[in-house]
């Protein structure tokens, strides 16, 4: 049963990059332990998927998995939604409302964007972690709950502690172990693996018999883009591009990075032609992106013969190998 449930998440947890495989290994070690876990990662890196994996590989897998985005609610609503409220606790509270902790009893509660939680909620979270008890808003009777807490953020929580915006004692309790998710730009070897998987899934959704594959130009575009939205953005871009490509038997050539443009370009603006990118920009990121594209182009032109690719770039073989390792190519 657990393997069946995990199947719905595995497609977005594909990867061969060492940094990603190390995360999966860490999660497998953490899952059986009944301890809080903190997941750190940029938007779109799959923080909730990791929380799901922690749940379904644990002894709690038959219990509920409940999630809540703390940034989606104001302070009062977040308090009520997490811990529940009694009838008459506030205007409009006509009946008792069980909170997410009660609903997650015996299972796992995943809290995304934890850094946005106000101090009052942080104090209550600490009490649940330490004593396994809470009080509904407007109530006076303590309730016992048995919940594993997995929290996620992209904020610098230690710095927030120093600035007085996050409780040091709560961070200590949450950070039994910290899972750091690498951004997609640091998983170059996984981009095409994921892109092909998303393309095949989209073809099935559209009722298309097969996916004809990506052209060299499309591949260069996918590998050369920085993916600020990470896996979520890659999935959206690939699905959009497959949809626009339709049932053509030719390789997919046009990658639609920006659907708001009248004419969809198949290469990022900063990477097309000899035009300079718009300012302001992050020069270091731009240089890394251009270096990556040149490495990819030399490999393609040399048909992935690394000594020939090194000659095309005026490098020694060992210099090329060092750059390929640097860019995870």
Segments from the language model and where they lie:
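Conserved post-Walker A coupling segment in P-loop NTPases
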Residues: 12, 25-91, 102-118, 146, ...
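Conserved RecA-like P-loop NTPase ATPase core
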Residues: 23, 45, 68, 82, ...
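Short gly/ser/thr-rich secondary-structure transition/capping motifs
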Residues: 88-95, 131-136, 159, 276-277
């Amino acid at each position: 049963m657990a393997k069946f449930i995990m199947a719905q998440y595995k497609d977005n947890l594909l990867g061969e990059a060492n940094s990603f495989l190390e995360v999966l290994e860490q999660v497998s070690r953490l899952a059986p332990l009944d301890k809080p876990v903190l997941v750190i990662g940029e938007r779109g890196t799959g923080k909730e998927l990791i929380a799901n994996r922690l749940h379904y590989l644990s002894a709690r897998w038959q219990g509920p998995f409940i999630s809540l985005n703390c940034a989606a609610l104001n302070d009062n609503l977040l308090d009520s939604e997490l811990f529940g409220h009694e009838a008459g606790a506030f205007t409009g509270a006509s009946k008792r409302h069980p909170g997410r902790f009660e609903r997650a009893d015996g299972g796992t509660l995943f809290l995304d964007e934890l850094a946005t939680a106000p101090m009052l909620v942080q104090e209550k979270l600490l009490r649940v972690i330490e004593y396994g008890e809470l009080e509904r808003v407007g109530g006076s009777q303590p309730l016992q709950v048995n919940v594993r807490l997995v929290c996620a953020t992209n904020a610098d929580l230690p710095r927030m502690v120093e600035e007085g915006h996050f409780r040091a004692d709560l961070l200590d309790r949450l950070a039994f172990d910290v899972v750091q998710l690498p951004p997609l730009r640091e998983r170059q070897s996984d981009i095409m693996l994921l892109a092909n998987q998303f393309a095949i899934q989209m073809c099935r959704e559209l009722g298309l018999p097969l996916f004809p594959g990506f052209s060299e130009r499309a591949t260069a575009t996918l590998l050369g883009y920085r993916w600020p939205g990470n896996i979520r953005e890659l999935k959206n871009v690939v699905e959009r591009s497959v949809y626009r490509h339709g049932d053509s038997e030719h390789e997919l050539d046009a990658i639609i990075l920006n659907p708001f443009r009248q004419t969809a370009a198949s290469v990022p603006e900063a990477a097309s032609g000899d035009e300079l990118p718009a300012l302001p920009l992050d020069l270091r990121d731009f240089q890394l992106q251009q270096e990556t594209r040149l490495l990819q182009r030399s490999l393609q032109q040399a048909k992935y013969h690394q000594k020939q690719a090194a000659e095309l770039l005026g490098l020694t073989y060992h210099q090329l190998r060092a750059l390929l390792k640097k860019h995870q190519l």
